[in-house]
Amino acid sequence: MASGFCSLALTVTTSLFSSHAITRRVLPILRWRSSSMSLSPLRHSRALSAATTVPISSSFTWDDVIETGRAEYNSSDLTGFFEKINRCNRGSEKLGEFIPFVIEEQIVGYIHKRFTEYLREFHDIFTFSQNGSCPDRVDGYVTLNLMLQKPEDRTRAVADVIKILGDKGIIPGIRNELYPVKPSFNAPVFFSLERAAAPYFGIKGYGVHMNGYVERDGQKLLWIGKRSLSKSTYPGMLDHLVAGGLPHGISCGGNLVKECEEEAGISRAIADRAIAVGAVSYLDIDQYCFKRDVLFCYDLELPEDFVPKNQDGEVESFKLIPVAQVASVIKKTSFFKANCSLVIIDFLFRHGFIRPESSGYLDLYQRLRNRDCS
């Protein structure tokens, strides 16, 4: 196509998420030499230090949460909310360290240039194209071998690579859960990728987050969960009543019902009352990881006598807390898992806890969706 890679160069540097097709090139089919994956100790150590994110843990208690929330909520001061949004949108100055990951002429992700060193070893799976017409702007792109035409073939081939990289500790925390790889939510799925590998390939990730609330004596209260200390990610931190990533092959509504049962013991009859209220999005770059997430937000008003009961062992306990107190905790602490704060801030807008009279109101609202929400 005429737009090709030269026009893409401007896209990568100034407007990362514009949809530009990339001219298809005939790429050589080379043999995959898996034995060449043996890395020198120095190189392997350096890769791990750059690629592994240390899980966040917290030793605070519910008493700490309640004590923090007791301070009077000041709806006019939005500073703490901006800080939480910034926490989920780090690393924009590092965009130049990544190159596009392309399938069928569509950008589906972004891969760190140094991480591509591992992928170059798998010659039958990944191919690399340089942009000869404007090399000063773009350092080429990564794609899959043209022999891999079917989604299921791509899924199997890439899964073999991820297993090797996972066994070597280069991609930690393998979950055996597949995420769809596609340029946008309603686009066709090009293949499926192990969830733990998603940020290393910079693919779009989707999730469902539900605000479970109760109205009592004219006051709104939110059910908040505290993650189990055995969780591999964000152990012991505060979380939504129900939240989860969106795997391949299940709808948002279907996944929400499943998560409601597993995480809080909410029956389908009650879960079906949840209302889809929008989405938030963010982009977080941390070393080799490039997270482009869209979270679909739901509200569910629960009966006053409802008490959640975790079924899958991933939640330590729950607490019903007035919304104004939850807002204060988000403002003043880092007790919440970072992306949960965004969904609750959106809830605060919709339920009148953040008002137009507050300085920065529109800026804050816009920044909840200031990345590619598609």
UniProtKB/Swiss-Prot annotation:
Q: Which cofactors go with this protein?
A: Mg(2+); Mn(2+)
Q: Where is the transit peptide?
A: 1-49
The entry's family comment says: Belongs to the Nudix hydrolase family.
Localization, UniProt: Plastid, Chloroplast
Instruction: Report what the protein is called.
Output: Nudix hydrolase 20, chloroplastic
* Residues that span the membrane, as ranges: none
UniProt function note: Probably mediates the hydrolysis of some nucleoside diphosphate derivatives.
Keywords attached to this entry: Chloroplast, Hydrolase, Magnesium, Manganese, Metal-binding, Plastid, Transit peptide
Nudix hydrolase domain location is 205-346
